[in-house]
C-alpha cells in the first residue's frame, strides 16, 4: 500500500531512461535510478501506475517515473519521467505531464509516517478522484480528462472544513486531518474516490487508516479556483532562448575532460544528455570515450529548447 521512494547520494550511477509513451513531455535523463529501486505495487506491480521515486540528497534533485520497469543492463523503461530541482520553485511546461496526471511532483504530496509520528504535516496532500474534466488549475500543468460531465479540473484543492470534529479519531489521524484543514489536498490523478496517497511503512496501522474512509466529501470545501485553464486559454509564452552551446575542445583523446558551456535566457532548469543529466549553472565537465553528441535541454513553463555540440 502506498507509493515507495528511495534516497540516493550524489555518487549514484546515472542510467538511461527508455520512454514508452510520453517521451516528448519527459525529461530525457540520464537519471540516478538504482537497479533495485522500489516500484509502486511491489512485489507484484502488475499493470498499475508503477511509479518510481528517487531523491538525490547529494544534489537536491527529485526524479519520478511513471509506468516504470527495469532492464537487465541497468537502464529503465518509463511511460514518462520528470526531474524536479528541490532548490527552486519550478513547474512543468503548460500541458505537459510529469509522472502524475496533473503534471505535479508526487513525493511532496505523500503522507509519510515520520511526519505523522512527529505530530505535524506541513504540506498539501495528494489525492485522486474517479473522474475529471479536460482542465487544470495551478499548480497543475496537465489534465487527463475522462469525463465531459465532471466539474473537477486537475489541481483542484479541497480543504477539510474548519468545524470538522477530529476528536473521535486517533492521534495519528488527527495529524492528517489537521493538515487537511490547514493545507488541504490537491487532485493529482484519476483513481479511487477521495483517495489520499502516502508512503509504505510497516509502522502504519492500516485498520486505523481505513477510518479516514468514513469521512464524506461533504466535509470538505473547494478552495477558490482561479484561473481554470482549458484548451482554449492555456498560457502562452516563449520557451528558453539558447544563444550558445560550446565545448572547450572539439577533438580530444578518449577519457580527456572537456567542459561544455552554454548561455541561455528564460530557463527554469537544464538537462544535458547523455552522461550528465540534470545540472545547475552554465557549464559542466564531461569525459567522452568516443565521438559524442551532447544535447542541452533548457526548459521553462512554456516549453523546451535544445542545442547540440559534437
Predicted regions and their residues:
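Conserved aromatic beta-strand anchor motif in extracellular beta-sandwich/beta-rich domains
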Residues: 272-274
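C-terminal edge beta-strand
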Residues: 305-310
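Short, solvent-exposed loop/linker segments at the N-terminal edge
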Residues: 250-256
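Solvent-exposed segments in extracellular or luminal domains encompassing
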Residues: 277-295, 301-302
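Proline-enriched interdomain boundary motifs that mark the N-terminal boundary
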Residues: 238-247
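Short, surface-exposed polybasic-aromatic patches that bind anionic ligands, especially phosphate groups
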Residues: 1-237
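Short proline/glycine-enriched turn/loop motifs at strand-loop junctions of beta-rich domains
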Residues: 263-269
